[in-house]
């Protein structure tokens, strides 16, 4: 169906919407989400948006992953909202990870916000995602990344002989 014409894809996506709404098994809903991410039409997009608010965390995680495939500023907005509002730590961690997977600098403010989270797992995941987005490696020091995130364009690393030796050994 993905290779078919746009009418066939739209019709299939509408069937997926009905399946998503009727399905009780979260594993099946998660698979429907994965399938929907590959279609660029309103019905498929509605499945991906709705999946973010599913009662089951497995489906919300699948929705986060679907937004990585979709990409763009809309994906950043939805993943940021999921990071900020979800009560399940696994979903929040996936949202932060997926923000990094987008490799879009527009995600930096949200990832900087994640550095301020009280949970060290969120902070660690935010550091890993900032490494992906920025292409830099400031180590795992959350404070160094906080400093960098304030103004990424102005940040420059201090060069020292000691730092060169540390990197060698």
Regions found by a protein language model. Give the residues of each.
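Pro/Ala/Gly-rich low-complexity, hydrophilic intrinsically disordered segments
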Residues: 138-169
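Conserved hydrophobic register position within alpha-solenoid helical repeats
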Residues: 32, 63, 95, 126-130
């Amino acid at each position: 169906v993905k290779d078919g014409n746009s009418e066939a894809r739209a019709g299939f996506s509408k069937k997926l919407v009905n399946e998503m709404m009727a399905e009780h098994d979260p594993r099946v809903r998660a698979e429907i989400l994965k399938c929907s991410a590959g279609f660029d039409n309103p019905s498929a997009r509605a499945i991906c948006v709705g999946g973010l608010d599913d009662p089951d965390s497995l489906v919300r995680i699948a929705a986060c992953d679907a937004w990585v495939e979709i990409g763009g500023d809309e994906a950043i907005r939805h993943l940021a909202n999921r990071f900020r509002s979800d009560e399940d730590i696994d979903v929040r961690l996936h949202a932060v990870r997926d923000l990094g997977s987008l490799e879009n600098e527009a995600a930096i403010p949200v990832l900087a916000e994640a550095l301020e989270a009280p949970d060290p797992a969120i902070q660690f995941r935010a550091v890993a995602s900032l490494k992906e987005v920025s292409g830099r490696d400031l180590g795992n020091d959350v404070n160094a990344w906080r400093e960098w995130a304030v103004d990424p364009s102005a940040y420059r690393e201090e060069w020292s002989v000691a730092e060169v030796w540390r990197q060698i050994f």
